[in-house]
């Protein structure tokens, strides 16, 4: 294919992907798909991960889109990002705005039940047990001032 025939934007799962990048790198532009997941999707779609996304034909892009949509059914449960939904108990792989909304719902649920993690989220402190004595300070600078002679 010539340089003029490249598609600079390829739309997959309501996201514009960069057509000038390799398939496995371009797929990471979708929120919820990282490097490992993108490699798995290219293997499921039977597409070369190092091929340029904009140079693929429509049939290959369709296979990639289908692999993204059916990712949950084709991989083991430990490879998805929502292994046991709190409300429904089902195994799902969330992408895009669904992932953002579900994350916000989880944080709001923790705040509402007043769990330790919810309170830490509310107050803007570190949640996962990191040290807070010397790092993560915001606001005024804390330090020792030298006495001027």
UniProtKB/Swiss-Prot annotation:
The reply to whether rRNA-binding figures as a keyword in the UniProt entry is yes
| Any one of the GO CC terms | cytosol
Q: What is this protein called?
A: Small ribosomal subunit protein uS13
- State the protein's purpose: Located at the top of the head of the 30S subunit, it contacts several helices of the 16S rRNA. In the 70S ribosome it contacts the 23S rRNA (bridge B1a) and protein L5 of the 50S subunit (bridge B1b), connecting the 2 subunits; these bridges are implicated in subunit movement.
Pfam families referenced in this protein's UniProt entry, alphabetically:
Ribosomal_S13
**Keyword Zinc applies:** no
- Subunit notes for this chain? Part of the 30S ribosomal subunit. Forms a loose heterodimer with protein S19. Forms two bridges to the 50S subunit in the 70S ribosome.
Residue ranges, annotated region (Disordered): 122-149
- Which InterPro entries did the record assign? Rbsml_uS13_C, Ribosomal_uS13, Ribosomal_uS13-like_H2TH, Ribosomal_uS13_archaeal, Ribosomal_uS13_CS
> What domain of life does the native source organism fall in?
Archaea
| Gene Ontology BP term (one) | translation
Keyword vocabulary terms for this entry = Ribonucleoprotein, Ribosomal protein, RNA-binding, rRNA-binding
Q: Do you know which HAMAP family this protein is assigned to?
A: Ribosomal_uS13 (MF_01315)
What are the protein's GO molecular function terms?
Answer: rRNA binding; structural constituent of ribosome
Similarity comment: Belongs to the universal ribosomal protein uS13 family.
Species the sequence originates in: Methanoculleus marisnigri (strain ATCC 35101 / DSM 1498 / JR1)
Bias regions of kind Low complexity — which residues? 132-143
